[in-house]
């Protein structure tokens, strides 16, 4: 506040990722639990983050300034994707960051100062849109393809490596490759299992997009505020372990975006998910029912072929299924693919 009083530029942005003081004010209040320590001295300050945001806006801060890169201090590593399910903030505005925190007060403040609530994050390159499971599988196939590393493994580790890839092959292929024989002599089956896996991956890559949506190019709109406020990432990684948001803020923030801002409840993110998909991944039955009342489509299919019920049924490994939400969505008309990855 003293810097603003002395004429500091409220729009000065980080040369590393484009973060402005306005974005930082929201982010510091709701910084996720990451591997990096987060300064806490601000909690003893006289002015709160909303006071600072209003002062920045009054001094001329651009409410629609966008992030140019995802900030390094909002990452995890070793999860199969860089953020462990946390949203990729490239292209995000302060308004979208507030929506991600389910912070209605901050969203209202920003909108009052002219923020555009319809600006989305930017879609990454297509190769970077894979799920945690897809990335894990890719690394497993690459490991199997490395002959030298494979030969250094113990017999049991070799068997596990081959059987893991074998387990993802079509049943028609597995019939001709008995599991007991693979476990006995994994080195003899390594190459043939690898070839089948690569062939299957090639076939999968040529399949039409199950969502029926046109592709989103790199740099196109990815995640909108409605997705951020409904739980984007909870069904795509382990965001639930790190994400911080306003207490009991899910429904109020979505209601604000739908009823006051006018967002379409069926708007899709770059992966083809709707707000119902994201609410389902968290088991938020109250929000699901609200979205349905507002015209939400429970039959929507994502680009990964997941129904809304699938998102509540262990959509990635180590994310537990939520039977009550699966049952609710089935009763509302969603199909259930019975593909619980946590249960496998």
PLM feature spans:
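Ankyrin repeat domain, specifically the short helix-to-loop turn at the C-terminus of the second helix
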Residues: 1-9, 54-62, 108-117, 252-264, ...
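Long, low-complexity, polar/charged, intrinsically disordered or flexibly structured peripheral segments
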Residues: 174-205
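Ankyrin repeat A-helix N-terminal signature
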Residues: 24-49, 75-90, 97-103, 130-146, ...
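Start-of-repeat signature of ankyrin repeats
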Residues: 17-18, 70, 91, 124, ...
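Leucine-rich solenoid repeat scaffolds
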Residues: 298-342
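Ankyrin repeat boundary/linker residues
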Residues: 14-15, 67, 88, 121, ...
């Amino acid at each position: 506040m003293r810097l603003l009083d002395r004429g500091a530029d409220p729009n000065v942005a980080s040369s590393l990722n484009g973060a402005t003081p306005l974005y930082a004010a929201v982010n510091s209040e709701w910084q996720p639990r990451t591997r990096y320590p987060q300064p806490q001295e601000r909690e003893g300050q006289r002015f709160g983050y909303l006071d600072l945001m209003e002062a920045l806006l009054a001094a001329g801060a651009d409410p629609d300034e966008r992030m140019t890169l995802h900030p390094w201090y909002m990452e995890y590593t070793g999860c199969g994707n860089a953020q462990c399910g946390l949203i990729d903030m490239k292209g995000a505005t302060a308004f979208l960051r507030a929506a991600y925190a389910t912070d209605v007060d901050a969203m209202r403040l920003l909108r009052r100062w002219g923020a555009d609530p319809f600006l989305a994050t930017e879609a990454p390159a297509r190769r970077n849109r894979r799920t945690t499971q897809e990335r894990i599988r890719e690394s497993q196939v690459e490991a199997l393809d490395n002959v030298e590393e494979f030969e250094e493994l113990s017999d049991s580790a070799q068997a596990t490596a081959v059987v893991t890839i074998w387990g993802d092959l079509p049943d028609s292929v597995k019939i001709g490759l008995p599991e007991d024989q693979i476990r006995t002599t994994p080195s003899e089956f390594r190459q043939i299992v690898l070839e089948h896996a690569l062939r299957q991956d090639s076939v999968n890559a040529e399949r039409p997009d199950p969502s029926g949506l046109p592709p989103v190019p790199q740099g196109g709109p990815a995640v909108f505020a409605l997705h951020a406020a409904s739980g984007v990432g909870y069904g795509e990684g382990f965001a639930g372990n790190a994400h911080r948001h306003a207490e009991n803020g899910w429904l109020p923030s979505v209601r604000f975006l739908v009823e006051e801002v006018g967002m379409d409840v069926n708007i899709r993110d770059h992966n083809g998910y709707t707000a119902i998909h994201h609410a389902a991944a968290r088991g938020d039955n109250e929000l699901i029912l609200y979205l349905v009342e507002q015209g939400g489509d429970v039959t929507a299919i994502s680009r990964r072929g997941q129904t809304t019920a699938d998102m509540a049924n262990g959509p990635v490994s180590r994310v537990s299924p939520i039977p009550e939400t699966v049952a609710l969505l089935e009763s509302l008309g969603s199909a259930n693919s019975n593909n619980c990855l946590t249960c496998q």
